Swiss-Prot record:
Taxonomic classification: Bacteria, Bacillati, Bacillota, Bacilli, Bacillales
Location(s) in or outside the cell: Cell membrane
Residue intervals passing through the bilayer: 2-22, 30-50, 53-73
InterPro entries: MrpF/PhaF-like
The gene coding this protein: mnhF1
Protein family membership: Belongs to the CPA3 antiporters (TC 2.A.63) subunit F family.
Protein name per the record: Na(+)/H(+) antiporter subunit F1
Source species, domain of life: Bacteria
């Protein structure tokens, strides 16, 4: 019974990932695309967690942590880009 529930949960999360891919393509704004990309990262983490429980292995939990860190960094970078128009600010003044 638990395996059937896990499979159904994986299917539901996969369908929601497809909806987020549509949001990335259609937009309409950059903020929508950023949020959809972040949501895909969370959904991917959920899929890996469900699969890890399904196969009874804790080794995939490291992958979940890595994806979470990368999703956070990506969202932070995109947010800074939206706010300032660039990611890396350079100080062009030379102090002698």
């Amino acid at each position: 019974m638990l395996k059937i529930i896990m499979i159904i949960a994986l299917i539901v999360v996969a369908i929601s990932m497809l909806a987020m891919f549509v949001r990335i393509i259609k937009g309409p704004t950059l903020a929508d695309r950023i949020l959809a990309l972040d949501a895909i990262g969370l959904q991917l983490m959920a899929c890996i967690a469900l699969y890890s429980i399904f196969i009874g292995s804790e080794y995939l939990l490291v992958a979940i942590l890595l994806i979470g860190i990368l999703a956070f960094l990506g969202t932070a970078v995109f947010s800074k880009y939206m706010d300032k128009g660039k990611v890396i600010e350079r100080d062009n003044e030379h102090h002698h």
